[in-house]
């Protein structure tokens, strides 16, 4: 019954947004209230669940999104994004530009959370699409494919790292096998899928105009832009800071030296929000003050960036409310009961449970972590490689992202797509990542 309620809730949401043309945020709130009541949630818990969902989601990403939007806007308004774009175009050529985006996104995706990588790469990818006069989606699909694969499969991302700890898997093996699975999966879900998507939703690839969330884009002569080195450094600084902190953290876990004040300070600096604040302050200097741009002009760019993402943040928060209602309403517990006593292979079972929880709850990390408790009892009676079970759980947890997932709304709003176009691109892309990932994991299980 809970899964039927979830399905009806999703259909109601689609009707409100696509049929009645109701504002997306309002629609999410209305459906969240309705689904909460239908699931039998006590009246005094409904509002608190919705507030917790909005607060929990925005508490995680509001700072990152806000600071990332300002950082991206400064790099774009100074001409730094255009300089990076023009240099990549010149080095790789128009024919190979997709591969440049895939490589850059994969490297960035290893170090950064999905949403951080997205807000940093969007201005650069948009600048490339404008420079070459090609569809933003032609580059956007490979970009998000690389970011999503690294988020689902590779440590030090929270999902794979936490799952490995729960299963007792060797983190080095997870990383090694994760790379083996991730590379072909990105190629299939990125450049190859882009060709297919262009056939099923050609209208979405015709959208080469400005992205509303980035505001009006300026164009520059090459000599007016900052140098390539300083532009890349400014854009990559959050990645550098977080990567250094992560490496030191991993060394501490591996070597086992004691915690101290220095390590605590490094973790503080390496936190995504702290790294973004530091990077933004550096960008104010490198993209503004150093180039004799008045501080007021720089701050105007920051203010514009914030004003342009307000509705996007509310929509993402609304998605978080829907997700929390499903979790608090007991949908996850219902799914757990369905799989008690099953005799399926741990790899397939881990993928299947994570997939159902992902579709039902929306959060990849919640789906992955919830799966571990159901799969762990089966691992004692199996000789399956634990690293592969970790990867299978990660693969299942990214499947079929839809309206209860913040990533769905990020992709839709950033690329200016309709609901139908978002389902045909983003949702299908995430499903391909999940299914292709499982396929490569099963192949790998034959030899390891």
Curated annotation (Swiss-Prot):
One of its GO terms (cellular component) is plasma membrane. Keywords: Cell membrane, Gluconate utilization, Membrane, Sugar transport, Transmembrane, Transmembrane helix, Transport. GO terms for molecular function: gluconate transmembrane transporter activity. Its main location: membrane. Pathway: Carbohydrate acid metabolism; D-gluconate degradation. The keyword Ribosomal protein does not apply. It comes from the Bacteria. It is found in: Cell membrane. It is a multi-pass membrane protein. The keyword Ubl conjugation does not apply. The chain crosses the membrane at residues 2-22, 23-43, 52-72, 106-126, 134-154, 174-194, 228-248, 269-289, 302-322, 347-367, 373-393, 428-448. GO terms for biological process: D-gluconate metabolic process; gluconate transmembrane transport. Belongs to the GntP permease family. This is Gluconate permease. It comes from Bacillus subtilis (strain 168). The lineage of its organism: Bacteria, Bacillati, Bacillota, Bacilli, Bacillales. The gene is gntP.
